[in-house]
Amino acid sequence: MTEVRATTPAGVVDAVVALLHARPGRVRLVIDGADAADPHDLGARVVAALAPRPALQVRADSYWRPAGQRLEYGHHDDMAWLDDWLDEDALRREVLDPFVATGRVLPALRDPVTDRSVRAVVVQLPPDAVVVVSGSVLLGRGLPFDVTVHVRLSPAALRRRTPADQSWTLPALERYTEERDPESRADLVVRADDPIRPALAPRTAPPPPA
């Protein structure tokens, strides 16, 4: 049985940082969670807490496909959002693979709001750096992450905290939970129904195949 431990928002950051400090060299961290769980905020706080260890946050939505591709079936096709919006090949090519090989990372490819390519400058990171990729529905894709964190919301909390204009993603998030089982894939699960009083559930069994 997985041990669940109550903590604080600062305690969540400390737990993630401890996982990273246990690994030498360059580390690729993913913080996965529905937008309502705000994985980007946790990613930013982890980057700040890692200092002076170099770290860079990459938002997964800055690696979405162009609108002409991802919106082929409409603006609110939840299955396309789950399976097709993320440009996995670009994320591998510009971030995950070169970071390990050379330390070079392109922090963003496209502005998810304007759909325009961004003029990001390639960043050269040292051998002990951490790249933090934050976003939704990122696990179970076979992407090469070294440390995995999933921020979990119960179905009730997810419905309550998801803005009305994003409610069309709820069926996809349900399918993601059922089919990809992100909790079983994560090194650390953050139970965040109460953002002031979260809980931690470290993994106690080997993860399923990617």
Where are these regions (language model features)?
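Pre-Walker A (Motif I) flank of P-loop NTPase domains
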Residues: P24-L29, D128
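ATP-dependent NMP and nucleoside kinases share a basic, alpha-helical "lid"
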Residues: D115-T162
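Flexible active-site lid/hinge loop adjacent to a nucleotide/diphosphate
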Residues: A157-L173
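Conserved nucleotide-sensing/catalytic segment adjacent to the nucleotide-binding pocket
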Residues: R59, W64-D115
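Hydrophobic/aromatic beta-strand patches that form the interior of the parallel beta-sheet core
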Residues: L29, L56-V58, V132, V147-V149, ...
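NTP-dependent small-molecule kinase module
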Residues: M1-R23, D146-V147, V151, A156, ...
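Post-Walker A helix-loop "phosphate-sensing" segment adjacent to the P-loop in P-loop NTPases
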Residues: V47-Q57
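Glycine-rich phosphate-binding P-loop
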Residues: V30-A48
